[in-house]
C-alpha cells in the first residue's frame, strides 16, 4: 500500500508539471520571409494623423497606396508597434500586418484573415503567409529591431532599395530609415545595411573623420544643387578612391594643390556649374597655383584667373564630383571657386559681397538643426531638384507648386566606426521675422471636432511643451510641439476646467490630473492611468478638480466638488479623513488655495457666501457680508480675496472677513482675470488692463487670459464671432500682426526653448493652430 501511494505521488507530480513552451517571440520574429519592405509604426493613430496633416507626403503615390492598404485595420486601436510587411509576387503585392493581440478589442472586427500566435496578431492578404509564419521562430528583420526608435513616426526597412538616378550617391541594396513627420517637416535618419555599400563608404573615407561643413559661406544661396565633402588628408583620399574600385589620377599639381585644402564641393546655378574649395593655408595654396597667374578680367575688384588643367578635378576625385572642365578661377579670402563659366564666378562674387550665400539663406538655417554638425558627404536640393528626387523615390507626380514652401532640403552621409548614417531633412522655409511679428508654426486637423481649448503641458523629458486637447468624442490627445499626435485616450466624459500637472512620485516625472463629471483621472506621460486611478464617483462632479500642494513638498491633495459637498483625496487615491467640510449651499466656484502670512485658505463661493476654510475644511474666517456673485473666479489681488458681483463692482475681502466694494462700471456679462498685481476686465467691447483701456471691435469675446513670461505681461482675448485673436501688452497696446485667425482662447508659452514664444488655439472646428510670436 505504501509503495502504491509513493508511485501515485510521483505520477501526480509529473502530470501536474507545466510542459507548455513559453514563447519568447516578438512581433519582429514573425515578419514573413522574403519581405521586401517592412514598415514599423509606433502608433497607428499618430501615423495616420502625421500623414494626413503633412500636405507633401499625403500626395505621394506610395502613401496613398499605404493608406488604402490600412483600411481593413480601422478597428485596430494601436498604441504599441504595428508592423506592415510587403511581399512582392508576380502580379501583386501581399500585405501582412503584425501587432500585439491586445490592440484588437473583443468587440472589434478585423476585415482581413488573421491568426493569433502567443498573443501576437498576424493578419495577411495571403493565406500562404499565415500558414508559413505559424512555425517561424525568428526572422531576418528581428535583428534590426534595435535600430527602431520610439520617437519616430515610423521606420522603413527596404531589403532592395530602388536605384535612384536623382541621388546616385544613395544607391544601396538595403537600407533602414526612421522618419519623423510633422505638418511642417519630414526628417529622416537611418543607415545603409548591405555590406557592399557600407564597404564602399568605409573605404572612401577610411581614416578620414567626418568634419564640419564650411562651403556654405561661399556658395550662392540660389544654387539648385550642392554636393560637398571633407578630407583631412588628400593623398589618403586618393588611395581610398582607388581602393573603393574607382580611379584617382592625382597629378603632382593635384597633390600639391589639394593638400592645401580640406573641403570641396560642386554647385549648380542657372549660369552653370562651379567647384568651391576651402584652403587650410591660403599662402601655400597661392604657391601651388603660382603657374596660373594670368588674369583674364576682374569683377568688383576680384581678379579672374585663367586655368588650363581642365581634367584636374575629374582625374583626382573621379565620381565624387560633377564632371567639369574649369577654365578659370577666383580666390575670395580662404575660398577658391573654379568654373568654365565667367558668369558663374561673377555670380559667386556678387552673392558673397552682398552676403547672399547659402549660410545667410533663411532656409539653410532652418534645416541645419536637424542635421549632424559633422558629415562625410552632404548634398542640398532646391525646390525643383527636390521634386525630381521625391517623384522618383515615392512614385509621385508632385509639381513645383506642391513644394514651393520647401526652399532648401538636405541629405548627408556620416561614416562612423561601424556604420554609415544617413540623415535628411525637408522643412518648410520661413523668413526671419522682425520683433513682435506673429507667424503660423503649424496647423493640425483631428478626425473629430474639438471640445476643450488646446493648452500647453510640460514635457518633463525635454523641458519643452506639448499640447493637450480633447475632442467631441471625449478623446484626449497629447500632441508634440511639432504637430505630431503622441497618443489618444478615450475618457468617460468631458474634462472639467483645465488640466493640471503633478509630480506624484517626486522624481521629476509629471502626470496629468483632471476631473470629468464622474471620474478623477491621473495619467502618466504615455497616456496610461496611474495606479489606483481613475477614481469613480456615482454623484456628478460639479466643479473642476482643485489640487493643493500646501507646503510645496509634492504631498498633493485632490479636492472634488459635488454640488454642496467637498471630498478630499491624497496621492494614493485615499480619502483624507481629517478634512470635514459642513455642506450648506451649492458651491459656485472652483475651490482655490492661497497662503497668506503663513496661513492656508481654501476659498470658494457657496450661495451668497465667500467661504474661507482652513486645511481641515473648517471655517478659518467668517466673511461679514453676503455677496451677489457674478460667477467670475476668485483671485488674490493686491493681498485681498477678489471677485466681482452682478452689478459689476469689484468685491475684495481681507483676512479678517471685511468686505470692500469698488464701482468699476462693468456690465452684467463682464469677464475678469487677475494676477497678484494686475487686474484685467472686459465689459462689452472695453478691455481694461490695470489703469489702461482699449476699445475693441464689437463682438462676442472669450474671457481674457493673462500670461506672465520673461518679466513681461501678455493679455489675450478672442473675438469668437469674428474669429480674431488679439494680444496686448500691460499698457493695453496691441502687438504687431494682430489680430490673427483663431476660434478659442489661447495658451501662451515658450514651447520649444528657442527665442520666440508660441501660442496655441483652436482653428476650424476640428483643427488646432500653433503660432510663433517673435
Where are each of the predicted segments found?
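Short loop/turn segments that connect beta-strands within beta-propeller blades
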Residues: 481-482, 525-527, 571-574, 614-617, ...
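Beta-strand-rich domains and repeat architectures in extracellular enzymes and scaffolds
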Residues: 443-474
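Repeated scaffold domains used in trafficking and secretory/extracellular systems
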Residues: 449-455, 494-502, 539-548, 585-594, ...
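Aromatic (tryptophan-biased) beta-strands that constitute blades/sheets of beta-rich domains
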Residues: 432-452, 484-491, 530-537, 575-583, ...
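Blade-level signature of beta-propeller repeat domains, shared across WD40, Kelch, NHL, RCC1
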Residues: 745-774
Amino acid at each position: 500500500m505504501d509503495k502504491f501511494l509513493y508511485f501515485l505521488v510521483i505520477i501526480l507530480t509529473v502530470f501536474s508539471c507545466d510542459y507548455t513552451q513559453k514563447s519568447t517571440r516578438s512581433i519582429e520574429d514573425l515578419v514573413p520571409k522574403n519581405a521586401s519592405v517592412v514598415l514599423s509604426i509606433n502608433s497607428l493613430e499618430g501615423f495616420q494623423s502625421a500623414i494626413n496633416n503633412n500636405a507633401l507626403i499625403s500626395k505621394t503615390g506610395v502613401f496613398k497606396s499605404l493608406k488604402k492598404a490600412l483600411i481593413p485595420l480601422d478597428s485596430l486601436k494601436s498604441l504599441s508597434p504595428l508592423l506592415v510587411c510587403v511581399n512582392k509576387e508576380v502580379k501583386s503585392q501581399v500585405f501582412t500586418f503584425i501587432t500585439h493581440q491586445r490592440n484588437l478589442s473583443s468587440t472589434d472586427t478585423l476585415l482581413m484573415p488573421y491568426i493569433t500566435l502567443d498573443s501576437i496578431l498576424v493578419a495577411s492578404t495571403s493565406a500562404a503567409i499565415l500558414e508559413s509564419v505559424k512555425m517561424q521562430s525568428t526572422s531576418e528583420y528581428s535583428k534590426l529591431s534595435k535600430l527602431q526608435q520610439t520617437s519616430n513616426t515610423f521606420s522603413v526597412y527596404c531589403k532592395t532599395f530602388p536605384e535612384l538616378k536623382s541621388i546616385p550617391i544613395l544607391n544601396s541594396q538595403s537600407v533602414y530609415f526612421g522618419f519623423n513627420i510633422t505638418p511642417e517637416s519630414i526628417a529622416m535618419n537611418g543607415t545603409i545595411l548591405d555590406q557592399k555599400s557600407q564597404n564602399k563608404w568605409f573605404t572612401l573615407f577610411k581614416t578620414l573623420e567626418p568634419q564640419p561643413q564650411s562651403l556654405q559661406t561661399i556658395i550662392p544661396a540660389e544654387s539648385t544643387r550642392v554636393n560637398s565633402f571633407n578630407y583631412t588628408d588628400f593623398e589618403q583620399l586618393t588611395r581610398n578612391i582607388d581602393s573603393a574600385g574607382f580611379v584617382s589620377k592625382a597629378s603632382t599639381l593635384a597633390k600639391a594643390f589639394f593638400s592645401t585644402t580640406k573641403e570641396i564641393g560642386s554647385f549648380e546655378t542657372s549660369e552653370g556649374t562651379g567647384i568651391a574649395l576651402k584652403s587650410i593655408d591660403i599662402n601655400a595654396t597661392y604657391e601651388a597655383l603660382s603657374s596660373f597667374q594670368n588674369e583674364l578680367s576682374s569683377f568688383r575688384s576680384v581678379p579672374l584667373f585663367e586655368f588650363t588643367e581642365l581634367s584636374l578635378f575629374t582625374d583626382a576625385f573621379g565620381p565624387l564630383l560633377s564632371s567639369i572642365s574649369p577654365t578659370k578661377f577666383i580666390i575670395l579670402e580662404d575660398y577658391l571657386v573654379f568654373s568654365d563659366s565667367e558668369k558663374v564666378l561673377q555670380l559667386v562674387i556678387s552673392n558673397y559681397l552682398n552676403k547672399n550665400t547659402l549660410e545667410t539663406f533663411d532656409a539653410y538655417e532652418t534645416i541645419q538643426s536637424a542635421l549632424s554638425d559633422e558629415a562625410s558627404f552632404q548634398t542640398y536640393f532646391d525646390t525643383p531638384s527636390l521634386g525630381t528626387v521625391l517623384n522618383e523615390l515615392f512614385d509621385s507626380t508632385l509639381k513645383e507648386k506642391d513644394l514651393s514652401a520647401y526652399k532648401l532640403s538636405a541629405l548627408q552621409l556620416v561614416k562612423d566606426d561601424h556604420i554609415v548614417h544617413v540623415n535628411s531633412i525637408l522643412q518648410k522655409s520661413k523668413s526671419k521675422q522682425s520683433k513682435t511679428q506673429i507667424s503660423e508654426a503649424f496647423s493640425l486637423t483631428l478626425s473629430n471636432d474639438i471640445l476643450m481649448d488646446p493648452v500647453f503641458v510640460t514635457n518633463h523629458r525635454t523641458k519643452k511643451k506639448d499640447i493637450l486637447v480633447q475632442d467631441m468624442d471625449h478623446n484626449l490627445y497629447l500632441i508634440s510641439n511639432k504637430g505630431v499626435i503622441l497618443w489618444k485616450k478615450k475618457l468617460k466624459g468631458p474634462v472639467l476646467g483645465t488640466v493640471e500637472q503633478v509630480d506624484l512620485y517626486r522624481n521629476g516625472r509629471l502626470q496629468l490630473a483632471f476631473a470629468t463629471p464622474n471620474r478623477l483621472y491621473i495619467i502618466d506621460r504615455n497616456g496610461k492611468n496611474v495606479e489606483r486611478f481613475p477614481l469613480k464617483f456615482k454623484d456628478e462632479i460639479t466643479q473642476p478638480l482643485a489640487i493643493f500642494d500646501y507646503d510645496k513638498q509634492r504631498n498633493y491633495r485632490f479636492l472634488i466638488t459635488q454640488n454642496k459637498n467637498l471630498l478630499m483625496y491624497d496621492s494614493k487615491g485615499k480619502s483624507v479623513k481629517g478634512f470635514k467640510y459642513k455642506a450648506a449651499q451649492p458651491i459656485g466656484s472652483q475651490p482655490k488655495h492661497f497662503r497668506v502670512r503663513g496661513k492656508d485658505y481654501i476659498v470658494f463661493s457657496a450661495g451668497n457666501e465667500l467661504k474661507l476654510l482652513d486645511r481641515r475644511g473648517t471655517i478659518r474666517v467668517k466673511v461679514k457680508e453676503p455677496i451677489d456673485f457674478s460667477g467670475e473666479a476668485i483671485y488674490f489681488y493686491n493681498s485681498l480675496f477678489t471677485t466681482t458681483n452682478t452689478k459689476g463692482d469689484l468685491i475684495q475681502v481681507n483676512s479678517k472677513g471685511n468686505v470692500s466694494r469698488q464701482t468699476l462700471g462693468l456690465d452684467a456679462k463682464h469677464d475678469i482675470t487677475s494676477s497678484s498685481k494686475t487686474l484685467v476686465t472686459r465689459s462689452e467691447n472695453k478691455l481694461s488692463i490695470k489703469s489702461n483701456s482699449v476699445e475693441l471691435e464689437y463682438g462676442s469675446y472669450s474671457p481674457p487670459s493673462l500670461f506672465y513670461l520673461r518679466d513681461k505681461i501678455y493679455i489675450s482675448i478672442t473675438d469668437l464671432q469674428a474669429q480674431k485673436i488679439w494680444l496686448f501688452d500691460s499698457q493695453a497696446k496691441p502687438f504687431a500682426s494682430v489680430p490673427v485667425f483663431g476660434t478659442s482662447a489661447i495658451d501662451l508659452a515658450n514651447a520649444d526653448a528657442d527665442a520666440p514664444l508660441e501660442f496655441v488655439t483652436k482653428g476650424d472646428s476640428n483643427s488646432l493652430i500653433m503660432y510663433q510670436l517673435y
